[in-house]
């Protein structure tokens, strides 16, 4: 008899992906969350998964309860009721750690690039053999017959510690989540602890000296552009159609590859995937074939064109990610003006990385800023304002609101890159509506 799973906070990116996966494996799945629309809920609705408003009435003892990591008894009535009644529940990462033991699991960790790399690895492997996966953009696939499970391993609050994968990629480490981590050394220690739990193979970006300090019982393979790495991407050609490159292992060419993706970071992501699958014994000709058809993941360089205007939506909310996204935009659109519209995410991150944000955004030709999106875990105490960031940006910068995005019209032959982890998509939708109305009025 199949179980019924109840997700407290089902619209969370990891939670929605896990819910979809369990649903596809034949289990009954339901969940609760706030009414506000979030991009992950579309997949749940299409699958027929019930999404309820938070209420203790949703809870019964016979449910398998999975709680999102952000929820506590003092901020969620369902979890408070579960604890009061003494019902058993698991946190998302605890459940996932137990769940993956039935598969050969492949994790993707790193400060940046986790979701894109997980998506790429899952895409290639599922087209070669039956594979379940869980991606941080809210998508998941569950198959009862799968041998492999590809998943995203999140370092925040050390959530990846219940995971003991056979293989894992670590794309990079960087100081982020200043509300939890005390500094880069704290971040490194978390990743090092995770690395010790990997069993058969660890694939690490080799051009960050700090990452060479990571230790593990599993064999470590380094990848990158430099000859000192085990897996090396060479003979790179970056065009408006994507990136072509060869990969060498122990000085021998193992294949020629094309990814329809932009930016140096996506070549590195692909090289990590190739390295992992090569060590697993997967046919490189099949890997090359399926790399070509990767269409990306949600909210990672997602493009749309409205009346000849190119709009890019990206989750970038850290300076390193902003630089990578703008680099990708320049590769694909070398003759266009790059206009960045950025919403800082959390006051703690904005304060901690103010100068770095200013430097990163200055890679664009023009910059527009939205008000800082505070997290539910923090209070705006006035320590930092978006105007403080605007004052540090070298390029032309201005402020926009959801109600007034018309300053964005002051550009010809431009690509508009909307970036952020908050509600930046509201600004994007306002701009799209403005463009649509202009088109209607000129017809």
Curated annotation (Swiss-Prot):
GO terms for biological process: cell division; cell wall organization; peptidoglycan biosynthetic process; regulation of cell shape. ATP binds at residues 110-116. Pathway: Cell wall biogenesis; peptidoglycan biosynthesis. GO terms for cellular component: cytoplasm. It catalyses: UDP-N-acetyl-alpha-D-muramate + L-alanine + ATP = UDP-N-acetyl-alpha-D-muramoyl-L-alanine + ADP + phosphate + H(+). Keywords: ATP-binding, Cell cycle, Cell division, Cell shape, Cell wall biogenesis/degradation, Cytoplasm, Ligase, Nucleotide-binding, Peptidoglycan synthesis. InterPro entries: Mur-like_cat_sf, Mur_ligase_C, Mur_ligase_C_dom_sf, Mur_ligase_cen, Mur_ligase_N, MurCDEF_pg_biosynth, UDP-N-AcMur_Ala_ligase_MurC. It comes from the Bacteria. Its main location: cytoplasm. GO terms for molecular function: ATP binding; UDP-N-acetylmuramate-L-alanine ligase activity. It is found in: Cytoplasm. Its EC number is 6.3.2.8. The keyword rRNA-binding does not apply. Belongs to the MurCDEF family. Cell wall formation. This is UDP-N-acetylmuramate--L-alanine ligase.
